[in-house]
Amino acid sequence: MALERTFSIIKPDAVKRNLIGEIYHRIEKAGLQIIAAKMVHLSEEQASGFYAEHEGKPFFEPLKEFMTSGPIMVQVLEGENAIARYRELMGKTNPEEAACGTLRADYALSMRYNSVHGSDSPASAAREIEFFFPESEICPRP
C-alpha cells in the first residue's frame, strides 16, 4: 500500500494544557511520521476560511471563537493508511463515545473542546494541508 498524507490539528485546549509532546509521541508510536509542523494563532479570517464548509451551521461561530482562542499546532502526517490510522488514534468526536486509549478519550474536555482534528478523506487532507503548508515546507522522511 502506498504512503498517504493526512492533516492534523492540536487544538487550543490541548496546547494550553501542554499536551503537544504527549500527542506527538502517540502519533509517532502509531507509525505515522510528522513531516511538517508549526504553531499558529488563527485569525478570525483564517478560521472562517478553513471552516468555510460549516458556514451557516449553528456551531460555526462557537467553533471559530474556540479555534481563535489560542495557538494551535498544525501538522502533516504521513504513513500507510494515514487518514484511517490517525482517525482511529483520535477516537470519536464525542469523547464520551471514544474508545479507551484514544486521544479524545484521554485528553478531550468535551465534544467542543476535543483536543484534536484530523482529515476525514483524501480530498479534505489535500485541501487542509494546502491551506497551511506550501509544498516547500513539507519534508518527507526516509
From Swiss-Prot:
Enumerate the active-site residues. Answer: 117 (pros-phosphohistidine intermediate)
Q: Name the major location.
A: cytoplasm
Tell me one GO biological process term: GTP biosynthetic process
- State a single Gene Ontology molecular function: ATP binding
What EC number(s) are associated with this protein in UniProt?
2.7.4.6
Q: Which residues bind ATP?
A: 11, 59, 87, 93, 104, 114
Q: How does it assemble?
A: Homotetramer.
Q: What is this protein called?
A: Nucleoside diphosphate kinase
Q: Which species does the entry assign this protein to?
A: Vibrio cholerae serotype O1 (strain M66-2)
User: Which lineage ranks, top first, belong to the organism behind this chain?
Assistant: Bacteria, Pseudomonadati, Pseudomonadota, Gammaproteobacteria, Vibrionales
